[in-house]
């Protein structure tokens, strides 16, 4: 009996030692990945290579009567690989969030495993307007289980689960931003609404367009604006750098106007999306592209059912009645709702 008991104790001790060794190896691996990721970020866009990053900034005035101003910035750093001859963005290897509201600030880091893009480390630093600081670090194993957590205070604001959920939300957001125009299906079977005569509808759209341009321009000058900015630097290292900027303007009812600009040494692009204030349906889209001295333009006007009633273009060989623009607009709205729901 004594021999059996000693054997059990020895086996338990051996198992504990093995678990400790595995944890130590995992912690060593995470710290190595963290150092390599930071080194890549420092070198991003340097030494003759194109930068590869995405920055999202959302500014919100939460209440016009009580000026609580919410601003959030997300930075994604990623690699590109050639898949079937096309440069394809990989999931980010590192994510940084900066958030502030009325003197309260929060800073987050998320490290992804370069092998399988799973979350392996999260860091959070928060500070109240009174100067109280909270810091938390979470380390995860290959199965996504937290194996170590470190805090500077017992009053932690987060848990291993909440930080991992946040990280996975950021990953989902990154994926949707990359596949804009392809992930939100259109409702093609919804009941038809009564429509206004074409001339009256076009007059209505042009009036709303002028109002939206004026409103968005005024917003740009506001100290406390309501807008979402997305800036993307990408393209392979053997191509000229490209910068894509998307500006989404919204009010308490939702998005009312979007403008997108894409610039590189090879080509330039610009597009606009206008939404009906009451229904938030897309009612007008504009696209302009310039490449090798050629300029292409498309304008689509939509009725109350989302059907194109007028197309103006100088490139009649390539027109889709605004189908892609409608999908892209739906995706922008879905991304905006994701961000609003996540903050709430």
What role is predicted for each listed range?
Residues 3-15:
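Sec-dependent N-terminal signal peptides
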Residues 21-73, 131-240, 294-344:
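Long terminal segments
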Residues 44-107, 111-112, 213-270, 274:
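Surface-exposed acidic loop/strand-edge motifs in secreted or periplasmic proteins
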Residues 96-100, 123-126, 150-152, 259-263, ...:
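Beta-turn initiation residues at beta-strand->coil junctions
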Residues 104, 117-120, 145-148, 256, ...:
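Short loop/beta submotifs within extracellular cysteine-rich repeat domains
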Residues 109-114, 135-142, 247-249, 273-277, ...:
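Aromatic-rich beta-strand edge motifs centered on tyrosine
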Residues 122-136, 285-289, 293-296:
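Acidic, glycine-rich flexible loop segments
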């Amino acid at each position: 009996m004594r021999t059996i008991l000693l054997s059990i104790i020895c086996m338990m001790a051996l198992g504990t030692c093995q678990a400790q060794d595995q944890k130590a190896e995992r912690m060593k691996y995470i710290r190595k990945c963290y150092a390599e990721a930071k080194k890549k970020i420092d070198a991003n866009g340097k030494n003759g290579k194109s930068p590869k990053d995405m920055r999202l900034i959302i500014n919100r005035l939460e209440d016009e009567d009580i000026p609580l101003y919410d601003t959030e910035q997300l930075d994604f750093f990623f690699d590109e690989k050639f898949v079937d001859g096309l440069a394809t963005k990989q999931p980010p290897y590192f994510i940084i969030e900066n958030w502030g509201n009325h003197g309260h600030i929060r800073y987050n880091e998320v490290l992804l495993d370069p092998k399988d893009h799973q979350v392996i480390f999260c860091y959070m630093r928060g500070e109240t307007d009174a100067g109280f600081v909270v810091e938390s670090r979470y380390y995860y194993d290959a199965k996504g289980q937290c194996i170590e957590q470190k805090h500077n205070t017992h009053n932690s604001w987060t848990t291993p689960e909440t930080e991992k959920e946040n990280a996975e939300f950021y990953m989902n957001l990154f994926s949707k931003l990359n596949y804009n125009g392809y992930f939100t299906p259109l409702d093609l079977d919804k009941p038809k609404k009564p429509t206004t005569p074409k001339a009256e509808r076009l007059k209505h759209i042009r009036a709303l367009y002028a109002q939206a341009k004026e409103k968005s321009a005024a917003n740009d000058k506001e100290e406390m604006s309501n807008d979402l900015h997305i800036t993307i630097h990408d393209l392979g290292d053997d191509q000229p750098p490209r910068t894509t900027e998307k500006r989404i303007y919204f009010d308490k009812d939702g998005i009312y106007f979007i403008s997108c600009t894409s610039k590189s040494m090879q080509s330039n692009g610009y597009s606009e999306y206008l939404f009906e204030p009451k229904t938030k349906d897309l009612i007008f889209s504009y696209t302009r592209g310039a490449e090798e001295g050629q300029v292409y333009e498309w304008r689509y006007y939509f009725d109350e059912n989302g059907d194109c009633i007028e197309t103006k273009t100088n490139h009649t060989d390539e027109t889709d009645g605004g189908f892609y623009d409608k999908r892209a607009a739906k995706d922008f709205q879905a991304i905006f709702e994701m961000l609003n729901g996540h903050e709430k």
